[in-house]
Amino acid sequence: MHIQDWNSETDPQIIRREKQKARIIRQSQWWKNKRAHNKCYYCKTDTPARKLTMDHVVPLARGGRSIKSNLVPCCKSCNNLKKNLLPLEWENFLSNFR
């Protein structure tokens, strides 16, 4: 990946388009089924489905996409703490947090 490619990944138009895709996916049966387990993907806390948020494992700002393999249900606490961290960065953060 070149620097130019990285910049194109975080283009505001691309991020807007990916957020729109996420809104559509949020209405899908697939997403309703994912939330039905009532568990945060990250901390495994029991959380009512209506309180689970959609998180991009690889954040949009870091080149992630709104595709099923990149979307997980998570509690608001984890989503707020994770922000734009990549999975390895998130794991390191949690290790230091504990």
Task: Walk through the language-model features, giving the residues of each.
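Short, charged surface segments at domain edges that flank catalytic/cofactor-binding sites
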Residues: H2-Y42
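Cys/His-enriched microdomains
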Residues: N38, L52, S69, P73
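Short, non-ligating residues that shape and space the ligands of small metal-coordination modules
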Residues: A49-R50, L81-L85
